[in-house]
């Protein structure tokens, strides 16, 4: 049975109310996304125990951290915290900064060691230096390492890359992605950056005005029209997890496999076998009720079925689609196209994908 992070908080302020209920997998990276003032940081403070919600419940795996009778303070919660600023101790070496939390963790509870954390975060050559000798990105990697060396059950990250430029963000994101895969430490990551979100997210929570607007896997949320206002029209469509299976040098293409289906994209400088997340915009999806009768320039045509049709505005419609691989994708079509196709739930269709965006090609990353 999968461990879950369960949380329910109600907090009232003169001009803002937080009212959320979450049931999240205690694995992978959960990204809390929303505009400024949506309640992201307040939620993180409640999860960490920095703030006690008057009406609150929190449980991770089999441990209750807050209910009507219980409130475990932050220092007893086995939580790692990483903020926008690295907050390193200037008088200590990088090694001593890293060991600060480790030395305050009971020996029996130390699941991670300095050498393995330093290796994963590429800090080995920095251990004897002082913080002032490090770049902003290096300092933030040290802050992440210090949090990990407390052997936390949960790592909370509050916009940790917000103060860094795009180049440094691009350097740090791969390290964050490795944390969960290497150490199996679940992460709750707060951001309002779409670039960071698309690089990192496994499970997504959209907050708006203190409430959960949408929650689910990245595939579910990006193919759901309910996310339209929060993530923007330009993001709706599909996010697919694929793996590189072959490079076609003659035609300059890379073959991507996912769940028994295939996509072809321009040649990528990525090794065969490596995973690659791709984004498909709903307006780059066209539909047909029959396979192409002749040769077509569209390389990516997938079989699927219609789940439902919705109205976006008087001239545009959304079509929720399930690919044969079981993955959701959203298409945006005109009213005229809908009339021509006469789409019905359950109807087999063919999805023509005109453009695919690779996540490592996102602007600035």
Model-inferred region functions:
Residues 63-68, 109-126, 177-178:
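Conserved ABC ATPase "signature" region
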Residues 64-80, 104:
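ABC ATPase NBD coupling module
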Residues 130-134, 138-140:
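Conserved ABC ATPase signature
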Residues 149-153:
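A short, proline-enriched helix->beta-strand linker immediately N-terminal to the Walker B motif
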Residues 155-159:
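Catalytic Walker B motif of ABC-type/P-loop ATPase nucleotide-binding domains
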Residues 181, 191-261:
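Internal alpha/beta loop-helix hairpins
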Residues 262-310, 335-365:
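Glycine/charge-rich catalytic "coupling/switch" loops of P-loop NTPases
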């Amino acid at each position: 049975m999968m461990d879950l992070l369960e949380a329910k908080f109600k907090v009232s302020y003169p001009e803002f109310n937080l009212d959320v209920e979450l049931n999240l997998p205690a694995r992978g990276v959960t990204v809390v996304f929303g505009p400024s003032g949506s309640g992201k940081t307040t939620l993180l403070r409640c999860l960490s125990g920095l703030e006690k919600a008057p009406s609150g419940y929190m449980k991770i795996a089999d441990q209750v951290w807050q209910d009507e009778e219980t409130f475990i303070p932050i220092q007893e919660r086995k939580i790692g915290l990483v903020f926008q600023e690295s907050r390193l101790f200037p008088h200590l070496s990088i090694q001593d900064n890293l060991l600060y939390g480790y030395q305050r963790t009971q020996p029996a509870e130390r699941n991670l060691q300095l050498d393995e954390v330093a290796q994963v975060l590429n800090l080995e050559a920095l251990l004897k230096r002082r913080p002032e000798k490090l770049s902003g990105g290096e300092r933030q990697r040290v802050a992440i390492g210090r949090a990990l060396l407390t052997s936390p059950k949960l790592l909370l990250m509050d916009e940790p890359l917000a103060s860094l430029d795009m180049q440094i963000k691009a350097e740090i994101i791969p390290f964050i992605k490795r944390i969960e895969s290497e150490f199996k430490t679940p992460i709750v990551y707060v951001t309002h950056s779409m670039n960071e979100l698309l690089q990192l997210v496994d499970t997504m929570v959209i907050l708006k005005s203190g409430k959960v607007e949408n929650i689910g896997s990245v595939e579910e949320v990006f193919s759901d029209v309910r996310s339209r206002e929060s993530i923007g029209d330009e993001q709706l469509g599909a996010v697919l997890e694929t793996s590189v299976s072959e490079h076609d040098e003659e035609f300059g293409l890379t073959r991507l496999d996912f769940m028994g289906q295939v996509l072809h994209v321009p040649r990528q400088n990525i090794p065969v076998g490596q995973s690659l997340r791709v984004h498909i915009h709903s307006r780059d999806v066209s539909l047909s009720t029959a396979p192409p009768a002749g040769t077509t320039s569209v390389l990516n045509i997938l079989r699927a079925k219609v789940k439902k049709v919705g109205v976006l505005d008087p001239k545009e419609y959304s079509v929720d689609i399930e690919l044969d691989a079981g993955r959701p994708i959203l298409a945006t079509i005109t009213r005229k196209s809908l009339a021509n196709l006469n789409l019905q739930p359950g109807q087999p269709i063919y999805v023509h994908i005109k453009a695919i965006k690779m996540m490592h090609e996102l602007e600035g990353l």
